[in-house]
């Protein structure tokens, strides 16, 4: 199916860490919706065809596993760490997130509120301000590099569930992924 798999073995601890990296980073954001890749990554953990966001969190917690879903400039990474005996189940959970996301509207609104709050809080932190301003000073806004990865208040306020599902359909798939 085109999924590239890379394995690095390190013996010593009964842990498995794996990441599903997809070429779906902020560079793929449409010019009018900076932050769409980041928002889509956050929404992956908010519901699938068979699990609610609470059930997803509970399943990872039951395994003692950690999960993060974040977009960078080039890639989106779903990173997981769990006990070695639980890695097949954790991998099945991650597969469910990227194969059957539902992007529930009520979760979308909650995530939007949280991200807008984070953006507003960041205005008081010089480091965060620099991270948001620098891309636009270095790169043209016509590229996928001239905006902050997390987007802008205007874009976050404007994006819709259709935007998220369209981005997911365009940017996610085994051909754009490395495990």
Task: Name the predicted role of every residue range.
Residues 2, 11-60, 92, 134:
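Active/ligand-binding-proximal structured segments within catalytic/core domains
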Residues 3-6, 55-179:
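Charge-rich, well-structured scaffold segments of protease-associated domains
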């Amino acid at each position: 199916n085109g999924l590239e798999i890379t394995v690095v073995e390190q013996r010593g601890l009964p842990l498995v860490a794996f990441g599903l990296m997809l070429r779906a980073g902020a560079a793929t954001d449409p010019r009018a919706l900076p932050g769409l890749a980041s928002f889509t990554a956050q929404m992956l953990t908010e519901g699938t065809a068979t699990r609610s966001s609470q059930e997803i969190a509970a399943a990872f917690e039951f395994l003692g596993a950690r999960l993060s879903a974040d977009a960078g400039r080039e890639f989106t990474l779903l990173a997981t760490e769990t006990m070695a005996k639980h890695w097949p189940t954790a991998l099945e959970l991650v597969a469910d997130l990227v194969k059957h996301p539902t992007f529930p509207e009520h979760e979308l609104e909650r995530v939007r509120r949280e991200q807008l709050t984070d953006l507003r809080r960041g205005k008081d932190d010089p480091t965060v301000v620099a991270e948001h301003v620098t891309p636009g000073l270095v790169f043209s806004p016509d590229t996928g590099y001239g905006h902050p990865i997390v987007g802008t208040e205007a874009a976050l306020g404007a994006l819709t569930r259709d935007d998220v599902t369209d981005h997911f359909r365009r940017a996610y798939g085994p051909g754009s992924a490395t495990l």
